Amino acid sequence: MDNFLALTLSGTTPRVTQGKGAGFRWRWLGHGLLELTPDAPVDRALILSAGIHGNETAPVEMLDKLLSALYSGSLTLTWRVLVVLGNPQALAAGIRYCHSDMNRMFGGRWQSFAESDETRRARELELSLETFFSSGQARVRWHLDLHTAIRGSHHLRFGVLPQRDRPWETDFLAWLGAAGLEALVFHQAPGGTFTHFSSEHFGALSCTLELGKALPFGQNDLTQFSITSQALSALLSGVEMSTSSSPPLRYRVVSQITRHSDKFTLYMDAQTLNFTAFAKGTLLAEEGDKRVTVTHDVEYVLFPNPSVACGLRAGLMLERLP
């Protein structure tokens, strides 16, 4: 199965759907779904996902290179792994999504969207994770969902962590720092993301990794993510990474800007970078007679997007943690 990406993009079913790699067994579970199981017993399970948005291709290329290293035997596998290419149709078309944003649909929220390929795929991925986690006895469960951002950022690589009732494990946060993430953003409320679903339903330590800017296949400079690729290789092979000398900055979400109607105006232009700072009292958005302003001394914007569909998030506002 050294042509997983090509098969996924073409929508082709392989003639052989299971086999042996170098020290592991593989099973093709469907388009964009590949299970890898080491020959030796392990108690660690990992979801490695990318391509939830079809125009975010750099992480897909990174996973393709990792799979090539595993199949060639140059990389040893020490986790049960489910590789997920989230939205094959959008990936093949080179667009963010075909109908609706899948990363708002998980945890059953797909039921509130008009039926589409994305709603069906979100349901399929939920079932795939349920099957994967229930079929093993993993003591450790991780989910790394790899993305790229629509716009530039003051932090080239950063992580977004779902709301979680229990404290985050230090080795997980340390690995994120070793993977080159410059900042970590902690959600304070549930959401429809893939990582919130895996964390809430299966107790996984989950993080959305944002790696640079969205570009078409073949136009990505993967060298700027070499530290993340090296960390993923070390993780898969069970090699401990040295901790970062400068730990990631930490932020928490303090509010969400939501577009409710066509009267919505976001006062940020296309050049506004993720993590741009705004002073207390700054007008961020208006919608009819409702005004959204900065309420803390300093807040930082994340994922500003004035053109989202009505009812969806047009941005997050953050505060720095000590």
Curated annotation (Swiss-Prot):
It comes from the Bacteria. Its EC number is 3.5.1.96. The active site is at E210. SUPFAM superfamilies: Zn-dependent exopeptidases (SSF53187). NCBIfam families: arg_catab_astE (TIGR03242), PRK05324.1 (NF003706). Zn(2+) binds at H53, E56, H147. Binds 1 zinc ion per subunit. Belongs to the AspA/AstE family. Succinylglutamate desuccinylase subfamily. Its cofactor is Zn(2+). This is Succinylglutamate desuccinylase. CDD domains: M14_ASTE. It catalyses: N-succinyl-L-glutamate + H2O = L-glutamate + succinate. Pathway: Amino-acid degradation; L-arginine degradation via AST pathway; L-glutamate and succinate from L-arginine: step 5/5. One of its GO terms (molecular function) is zinc ion binding. Transforms N(2)-succinylglutamate into succinate and glutamate.
